[in-house]
């Protein structure tokens, strides 16, 4: 019986670790976080419960790794209107 409980807990922990995503997080205005420094993005991503992040210089937007599935990300454009 204890073995079955152990397997159930281990499985749920493993699934939780696998359910992470990456991408450009965005704010309440549907805009990506503009950046110039990697440290700013790394701190932002960790605040959003991600593992790490960096400033993608080509489009000057924060890119995060290991975000929870509940965090919204935009794969393309920098800013979107709410309408």
Swiss-Prot record:
Alphabetical GO biological process terms: defense response
Domain notes: Has the structural arrangement of an alpha-helix connected to antiparallel beta-sheets by disulfide bonds (CS-alpha/beta).
UniProt note on tissues of expression: Expressed by the venom gland.
Domain LCN-type CS-alpha/beta, residue spans: 21-80
Protein name: Neurotoxin LmNaTx10
Organism: Lychas mucronatus (Chinese swimming scorpion)
Protein's job: Binds voltage-independently at site-3 of voltage-gated sodium channels (Nav) and inhibits the inactivation of the activated channels, thereby blocking neuronal transmission.
Single GO cellular component term: extracellular region
Pfam families (UniProt xref): Toxin_3
SMART domains: Knot1
Keyword annotations from UniProtKB, A to Z: Disulfide bond, Ion channel impairing toxin, Neurotoxin, Secreted, Signal, Toxin, Voltage-gated sodium channel impairing toxin
């Amino acid at each position: 019986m204890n073995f079955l409980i152990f397997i159930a807990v281990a499985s749920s922990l493993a699934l939780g670790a696998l359910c992470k995503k990456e991408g450009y997080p965005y704010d309440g205005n549907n805009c990506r976080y503009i950046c110039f420094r990697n440290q700013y993005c790394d701190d932002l991503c960790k605040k959003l419960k991600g593992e790490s992040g960096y400033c993608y210089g080509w489009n000057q937007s924060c890119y995060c790794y290991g975000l929870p599935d509940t965090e919204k990300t935009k794969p393309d454009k920098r800013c979107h209107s709410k309408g």
